[in-house]
Each structure stands twice: as structure tokens, then as C-alpha cells.
């Protein structure tokens, strides 16, 4: 895989700023706490309310601007208080440790008031602040702990003294931390265990990081994980120390010197229990999660500009990544993914993205399992037809993390405008779309399935509800490997704009149906006669008795009149895989739309293209077998 720079935490990974509101009964020391923080000394004269204070990002531990807001019952109305509550990211409820009345008001007034004014679905963290600890020789924690256990929104409790400057900076650090690294989404204090959503997210992270898919993180994988998350590797002794901590508490936390999933989850539970939530949050955010433990839109759908008349393809680095992904899950090394292997691959997805139609869109083995070539073909198809979905899928697989790229947009090549290709009479594209047009029952499905090497016998086994309107496979033209994407266009009187857009058209008629060719001729005249899109007419079911077509001109004369190659005889009723000649011709026409019709009619032109395909198919098979031996 390509090495690159580590992606820093993006602005979207954490809140852009933190707004802290201090509330509590009069004279508990709210204003004094703020002024002591700012001036680093206890104020002799304290105003009724401190002005809003902004602490710049460069002086806070988390490098996030922080706004501290004071509340004064004497100066502000209930409406203003409600507005401040709605704007706050975290609220510090201040009480005086020497004033039982102010402690009682925490539960009788402040927590109910805050809960009434906040959305039930959005969790607003609370910090309980016991001020004036310099005035007593005892702690209020015995009284406060039951309150903390009752209200899960309470992140922590801090006892401090504005007069002695005790725990002042810690108080605001904990408040900031409660916003940026909240405990609530991660951990359930009552159960003393991580929440299901957190376990699910960390399990996905573990599976992505387990690059050899052996169920453990070995030293190399742990070091890579440490480096991409924290920008620093772990020393060998530090790695061993971590594993020893796990061994001490879990019998199955370490296996074969590697950290198991249970061990990985235990470590994060330990971080959270010891107040090191930021460690777990750093990992979660590095892998694309937001505060609700959902993958962010910025992570799944990075910006990718696609100008008109341009297409999207996977680049070389993306194919290398997908090859390694396939290898990771092809446990039996048969160059195909069984249903269980495919299910294992998709465990890092929130849903199974491929339906049964995919098995009839790409190449499969005799068992109907997607082959290595079929796997790459399906990704190629998704990239071409729906690049946003491709970005999403690559995001689930952790592409940007494992390849150390800014985002999965780096996996995509946006081709140049097709008009430039026509002007320069050459193309850099590797994927070509062919729309297959004809009346229902003319043999279009046979054409699509033949691209995948399936004869009529295999096609008859396809269930109607598993049928696909697409087929994609590689085709060699002049020694170059290209992808040909066939799209079965449903029969209709007029084609839509989307059904016309393609690189080449395959007009299919049934030689046994006298009314079949008329539709092809009509569609050609309506949409393609004056366009620059090359067309090829295919005479399907050519193994059967041919009847005369009920059209004013025969298919052969029609092709001659419109300077097209002659009709191509085609059948999928063969003992072995059907001939790929028409697919070489279609791909060649898509690659060289500027080639004259005289050249297209030339047998030597097609012979050169087909010869390159044959040679490279043989070479490709030899290389494939060599790869199999290596694996």
C-alpha cells in the first residue's frame, strides 16, 4: 500500500468551540471562579456577574476556543437563563460545600430546569462544582455521589476554591473535556461497561486494523494503529506492558502474542474508567465517528468535483487496496469469496451492500461465488454508476486510514471531458459503457450473461428476482485491459436522455422474430443516426433458423446504408463459454469512436484487436496461475 502523510483531526471531527455556562444559587462563588481563572488571583471585589470570557484556542489543552458564561439571578431574567441553557455545550452547577441549601437546590431546582430546557435526544453534559472548599475540613463527595449515580448526564464532580485557586483550571478543563470527550455515548456507569454503540464502533475499528484477518492485532498492526491514531509508535517494551495489563485481567485478551477483540475492548473500557476518555475519542474520531458514534458525512462523502461529460474510475492505488481487501477475506485461497467470506468482509458495513443480483452482474465460479475478477468488476461498476456510494463503501472499509490518505476521494480518477477525447482521437478511460437495446425477448440477457462467460445452460438457472440489468467484465483490445459495462435498456417507444448516454450502442434483434429488427432500426433513427455514438447491430440466436425481417430494408442493407459494420451473428447456446468477439468489437468502437466506418468494416482491423485480446488473455491466465501459486 502507498505510504503517505497521516491525516490530522479535521475541524468536523470535534466541536469548533466550547461554550461553558455556570449556574447555581446566589453567592456560591460562580463569578469568583471565573475571575480567579482569568486573573490567577482571588478578586477582592466581585461584580454581580462576569462578562462573557473567550479563551483562545492556543492556550487551551484541546486547542479549541472556549467561551465561559456567568449567570446572575439578580441581573438576568428567566427567559435569558433559558436562552443561555439552550446555547451551552456544558453546564457547571456550582454549589458551596459549606451551604447545604445550595447542595439541595442542585436536584430540586437546577437539574430539572436544565432537563426541561434541553432536547431529550441531545445529551447536555453537567459538571457539579463544589466551591469554597477552603472554608471546611470535610468533603461534600458523600452527599454528591448519590446525585451523580442518579443522573447519568453528570460527567464529574470537582471540589475547588476560588480563594486558594485550588482546582480552578482543572474545573474548566473537565468542562471542556465533557464536551469534546463525553463519557455518555461511551460508557454506562450503572452497568460499569461500554455502551453497545461504542462496542460496535470499536469492533469495526478492530476489524479494519486486523489487516491479516487472523482475529488478533499483532505487534506490526498495533504499531500501525498507534501511529495513525496518535502519530507515534509504541516501543517494544510498551507494547509488551500493554499486553501484560490485558493478560492480568482477561484469560482470552491476548492470543499468540496478539491482542484479541476482547482485549482491545477491555483496554478502552479501562481508559474510560480511569478518566482517559480522550484516548478512546481520539481513536473513534480518527476512524470517522462523531459524538453520536455515527460515521460523519465528511468522512463518508468527501468532496469530489465531477465536471459534465466526465466519468469516474478507480485508480491504481484503489485497485491495490481492493486486491488486499479481497486477499484478507479469501481465507481458503480459492480466488473466490464464499457467502461466509463475503459476510465477514461486510461486517465493517452497517448493512449488506450487495444483493443477489450482483452475482449475475459480475463473474462467479461454478458455485456462484464472486471471483477475484468479479469483485474488482463490481467495485468498478459502482464507481462508474454511483461514485458517492463507492466513496461511502470505501469509507466503511477504512480506505483513507489504511492507505494514509486525506480521504477516499484519492481513490478516484475523474476522466477528462469526452469531447477532448474525440478531438485528440485517443482516450485515457478504462471503463466503457455500452447500452444494449432491443425488444423484450430478443436475447439481450443472453448478451449480458455471455460477457461473464455464461452459456445458455447456465443462464437458465438464474432466478427472475435475481436478474441484473448490468454486466461488467474485462476485455482486451490491442493488448490493453479495459472494462466493458453492458446496460440492458428496457423496451420503450422513446428513450430517455439517461438511456442514450453511453460510449457505444449494441442494437440486438432476434433472427427468429420477424418484427424484432424494426425496433432497432427505429431507435437508431430516432436517437443515434446523427450522433457520434458508434453502433453495432447484433443478430441474436443465430444458431436457430433465421426468418426474414418485416422491415423495408434488410439488416445487412441497413448497416451498409448507414455505414455501420455488418450485423454480428451471435449465440449463447454453446457447449462452452460463448464467443467474446462482439465484446472486443464493442469495446474497440467505444475506445476509437473516431475510426472511419471503412476501418470498422476491415477484417484486419478486428483481427489486430482480437489478436491482442487473445495474447493478453493467455498471458493474463499465466500470471493469474503464478499469483495463485504465490498465495
From Swiss-Prot:
Keywords: Acetylation, Calcium, GTP-binding, Hydrolase, Isopeptide bond, Magnesium, Membrane, Metal-binding, Mitochondrion, Mitochondrion outer membrane, Nucleotide-binding, Repeat, Transmembrane, Transmembrane helix, Ubl conjugation. One of its GO terms (cellular component) is mitochondrial outer membrane. It catalyses: GTP + H2O = GDP + phosphate + H(+); ATP + H2O = ADP + phosphate + H(+); UTP + H2O = UDP + phosphate + H(+). It is found in: Mitochondrion outer membrane. GTP 1 binds at residues 27, 29-32, 72, 131-132, 134, 162-163. Residues 15-181, 429-592 form the Miro domain. Ca(2+) 2 binds at residues 330, 332, 334, 336, 341. Residues 629-631 are mitochondrial intermembrane. There is a cross-link at residues 166, 248, 585 (Glycyl lysine isopeptide (Lys-Gly) (interchain with G-Cter in ubiquitin)). Ubiquitinated by PRKN during mitophagy, leading to its degradation and enhancement of mitophagy. Deubiquitinated by USP30. Acetylation on Lys-105 decreases sensitivity of mitochondrial transport to elevated Ca(2+) levels, increases mitochondrial transport and promotes axon growth. Deacetylated by HDAC6 which blocks mitochondrial transport and mediates axon growth inhibition. It holds the Pfam family EF_assoc_1. Its EC number is 3.6.5.-. One of its GO terms (biological process) is establishment of mitochondrion localization by microtubule attachment. The keyword Iron does not apply. The keyword Signal does not apply. Homodimer. Interacts with the kinesin-binding proteins TRAK1/OIP106 and TRAK2/GRIF1, forming a link between mitochondria and the trafficking apparatus of the microtubules. Interacts with RAP1GDS1. Interacts with ARMCX1. Found in a complex with KIF5B, OGT, RHOT2 and TRAK1. The Miro 2 domain is necessary for efficient ubiquitination by PRKN. This is Mitochondrial Rho GTPase.
Amino acid at each position: 500500500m502507498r505510504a503517505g502523510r497521516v491525516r490530522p483531526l479535521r475541524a468536523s471531527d470535534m466541536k469548533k468551540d466550547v461554550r461553558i455556562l455556570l449556574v447555581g444559587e446566589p453567592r456560591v462563588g460562580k463569578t469568583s471562579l471565573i475571575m480567579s481563572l482569568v486573573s490567577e488571583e482571588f478578586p477582592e471585589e466581585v461584580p454581580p456577574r462576569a462578562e462573557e470570557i473567550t479563551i483562545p484556542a492556543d492556550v487551551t489543552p484541546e486547542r479549541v476556543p472556549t467561551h465561559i458564561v456567568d449567570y446572575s439571578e439578580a441581573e438576568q431574567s428567566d427567559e435569558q437563563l433559558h436562552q443561555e441553557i439552550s446555547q451551552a455545550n456544558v453546564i457547571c452547577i456550582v454549589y458551596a460545600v459549606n451551604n447545604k441549601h445550595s447542595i439541595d437546590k442542585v436536584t430540586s431546582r437546577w437539574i430539572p430546569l436544565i432537563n426541561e430546557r434541553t432536547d431529550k435526544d441531545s445529551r447536555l453534559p453537567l459538571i457539579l462544582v463544589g466551591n469554597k472548599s477552603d472554608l471546611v475540613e470535610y468533603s461534600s463527595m458523600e452527599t454528591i455521589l448519590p446525585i451523580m449515580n442518579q443522573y447519568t448526564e453528570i460527567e464529574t464532580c470537582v471540589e475547588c476554591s476560588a480563594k486558594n485557586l485550588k482546582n480552578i483550571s482543572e474545573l474548566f478543563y473537565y468542562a471542556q473535556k465533557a464536551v469534546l470527550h463525553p463519557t455518555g455515548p461511551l460508557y454506562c456507569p450503572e452497568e460499569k461497561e461500554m455502551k453497545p454503540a461504542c462496542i460496535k464502533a470499536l469492533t469495526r475499528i478492530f476489524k479494519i486494523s486486523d489487516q491479516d484477518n487472523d482475529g488478533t492485532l499483532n505487534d506490526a498492526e498495533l504499531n500501525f494503529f498507534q501511529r495513525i491514531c496518535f502519530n507515534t509508535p509504541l516501543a517494544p517494551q510498551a507494547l509488551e506492558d500493554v499486553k501484560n495489563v490485558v493478560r492480568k485481567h482477561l484469560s482470552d485478551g491476548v492470543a499468540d502474542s496478539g491482542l484479541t477483540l476482547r482485549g482491545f475492548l477491555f483496554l478502552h473500557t479501562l481508559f474510560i474508567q480511569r478518566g482517559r476518555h480522550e484516548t478512546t475519542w481520539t481513536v473513534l474520531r480518527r476512524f470517522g465517528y462523531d459524538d453520536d458514534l455515527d460515521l460523519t458525512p465528511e468522512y463518508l462523502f468527501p468532496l469530489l468535483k465531477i465536471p459534465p461529460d466526465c466519468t469516474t474510475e478507480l485508480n491504481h492505488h484503489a485497485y491495490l487496496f481492493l486486491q488486499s481487501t479481497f486477499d484478507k477475506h479469501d481465507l481458503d485461497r480459492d480466488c473466490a469469496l464464499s457467502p461466509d467470506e463475503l459476510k465477514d468482509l461486510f461486517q465493517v458495513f452497517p448493512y449488506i451492500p450487495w444483493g443477489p443480483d450482483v452475482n449475475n452482474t459480475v463473474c462467479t465460479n461454478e458455485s456462484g461465488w464472486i471471483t477475484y475478477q468479479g469483485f474488482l468488476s463490481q467495485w468498478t461498476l459502482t464507481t462508474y454508476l454511483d461514485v458517492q456510494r463507492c466513496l461511502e463503501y470505501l469509507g466503511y472499509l477504512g480506505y483513507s486510514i489504511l492507505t494514509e490518505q486525506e480521504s477516499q476521494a484519492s481513490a478516484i480518477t475523474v476522466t477528462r471531458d469526452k469531447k477532448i477525447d474525440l478531438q485528440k482521437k485517443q482516450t485515457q478511460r478504462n471503463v466503457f459503457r455500452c447500452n444494449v437495446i432491443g425488444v423484450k425477448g430478443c436475447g439481450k440477457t443472453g448478451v449480458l450473461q455471455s460477457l461473464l462467460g455464461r452459456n445458455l445452460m447456465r443462464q437458465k438457472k438464474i432466478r427472475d428476482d435475481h436478474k441484473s440489468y448490468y454486466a461488467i467484465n474485462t476485455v482486451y483490445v490491442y493488448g490493453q485491459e479495459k472494462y466493458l459495462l453492458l446496460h440492458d435498456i428496457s423496451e420503450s417507444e422513446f428513450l430517455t436522455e439517461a438511456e442514450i448516454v453511453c460510449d457505444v450502442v449494441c442494437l440486438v434483434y432476434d433472427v427468429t422474430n420477424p418484427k424484432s429488427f424494426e425496433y432497432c432500426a427505429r431507435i437508431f433513427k430516432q436517437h443515434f443516426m446523427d450522433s457520434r455514438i458508434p453502433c453495432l447491430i447484433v443478430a441474436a440466436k443465430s444458431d436457430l433458423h433465421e426468418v426474414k425481417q418485416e422491415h423495408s430494408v434488410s439488416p445487412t442493407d441497413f448497416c451498409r446504408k448507414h455505414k455501420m459494420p455488418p450485423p454480428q451473428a451471435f449465440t449463447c447456446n454453446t457447449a462452452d463459454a460463448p464467443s467474446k468477439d462482439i465484446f472486443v468489437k464493442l469495446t474497440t468502437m467505444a475506445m476509437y469512436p473516431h475510426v472511419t466506418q471503412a476501418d470498422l468494416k476491415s477484417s484486419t482491423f478486428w483481427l489486430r484487436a482480437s489478436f491482442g485480446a487473445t495474447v493478453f488473455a493467455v498471458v493474463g491466465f499465466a500470471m493469474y496461475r503464478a499469483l495463485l501459486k504465490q498465495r
